[in-house]
Design a protein with these regions (language model features):
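Canonical Rossmann dinucleotide-binding motif of NAD(H)/NADP(H)-dependent dehydrogenases/reductases
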Residues: 2-32
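Conserved glycine-rich Rossmann-like NAD(P)H-binding loop of the short-chain dehydrogenase/reductase
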Residues: 29-43
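Conserved mid-core segment of classical short-chain dehydrogenase/reductases
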Residues: 70, 91-106, 128, 146-154, ...
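Amphipathic alpha-helical dimer-interface segment in Rossmann-like NAD(P)H-dependent oxidoreductases
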Residues: 74, 110-128, 142, 170-175, ...
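Catalytic loop of short-chain dehydrogenase/reductase
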Residues: 92-96, 133-161, 166-174, 186
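Catalytic Tyr-X3-Lys loop
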Residues: 100-117, 135, 155-158, 162, ...
Length: 243
C-alpha cells in the first residue's frame, strides 16, 4: 500500500507515536491521532503533520471504552473521508509485584482489548475500501517465548495476547486487510533510568545501544507498504532476544 493519499488512525501518539506519525505524514498520509490525557502532545504532533501538507485531526478517546473507540473511528472517517491504516500503539507498561484483578483488567484492557476493539471497528471500513493495514504492538519478550522478569505478569500476558490477536485477525480479515505486529525491545531509555541500569541494558543488547523511535517508524512503514506479509512479527530489539 502506498501511504500517499491514505488516512491512518494512530492510538497513543506520544513519544514514539510522534515519530511514527511524522514518518507517515512525510509519505503523504493524513492522520487521526487519539489521546486520553496528553492533548497538548497530540496537538503538537498534528500541527507538525499539517506543516507537511496533509490533514490531521485530534480526538480524545479512552482506549478501554468501546463506545469512545467506535466514536473515534466514525469521527476519523467523517473528518478525513476514509480510513486505511490503523496503528494500535496505546499501551500501559506497569510493574505489578502483587497483582490483583484490578491490575489484570486495567492492563489487559489497555493493551489487548483496545487493539481488538479498534481493529473490529476499523475493519469494515477498510474492507469497503478494498484494502487496509493494521499494525499492532506486542513486546520482544512474549514474542520470543518466555518471561525473563518478575513482577510483570499482567503486562506480559497482555502483550502475549496482542501477539495471538495479530495472528487471529490476520487470518480473519484476509485477503483485504493485512495485520502484523512490532515487538519492540530497548527503543527509548526511560527518563528515570540509572547509569547502572543503562549499562545492564546495553550489555544485554548485542547491538549495544538504544534503538531510537526512528527504528519503529521504519518498521511501521514496511508493514504499511508490504503487500504480501500478514500475521507476522518483527522484533525491533537490537538482538536483545538472542542474549
Amino acid at each position: 500500500m502506498d501511504p500517499n493519499g491514505k488516512v491512518a488512525l494512530i492510538t497513543g501518539g506520544a513519544r514514539i507515536g510522534q515519530v511514527v506519525a511524522g514518518a507517515l505524514a512525510n509519505r503523504g498520509c493524513s492522520l487521526s491521532l487519539t489521546y486520553r490525557d496528553s492533548r497538548d502532545a497530540a496537538e503538537k504532533t498534528a500541527g507538525a503533520a499539517r506543516a507537511t501538507g496533509v490533514k490531521a485531526t485530534v480526538l480524545r478517546a479512552d482506549a478501554t471504552d468501546e463506545t469512545e473507540i467506535a466514536a473515534a473511528v466514525r469521527e476519523t472517517v467523517k473528518s478525513l473521508g476514509r480510513l486505511d491504516i490503523l496503528i494500535n500503539m496505546a499501551a500501559v507498561y506497569q510493574k505489578t509485584p502483587n497483582p490483583d484483578g484490578v491490575h489484570w483488567s486495567a492492563i489487559q484492557d489497555a493493551n489487548a482489548k483496545s487493539a481488538f476493539l479498534y481493529s473490529i471497528h476499523s475493519a469494515p471500513i477498510m474492507k469497503q475500501n478494498g484494502s487496509g493495514r493494521i499494525v499492532n504492538f506486542s513486546d520482544w519478550l512474549p514474542v520470543t517465548g518466555r518471561p525473563q522478569y518478575k513482577d510483570y505478569v499482567p503486562y506480559y500476558v497482555s502483550k502475549a495476547s496482542v501477539a495471538a490477536l495479530t495472528e487471529a485477525l490476520a487470518l480473519q480479515l484476509a485477503p483485504e486487510i493485512l495485520v502484523n505486529a512490532i515487538a519492540p525491545g530497548p527503543i527509548l531509555a526511560p527518563p528515570n533510568l540509572t547509569p547502572e541500569e543503562n549499562a545492564q541494558v546495553l550489555e544485554a543488547t548485542p547491538l549495544a545501544r538504544w534503538g531510537g523511535a526512528e527504528e519503529i517508524a521504519k518498521t511501521v512503514l514496511f508493514f504499511v507498504e508490504t503487500d504480501f506479509v500478514t500475521g507476522e512479527f518483527i522484533r525491533v530489539d537490537g538482538g536483545r532476544h538472542l542474549s
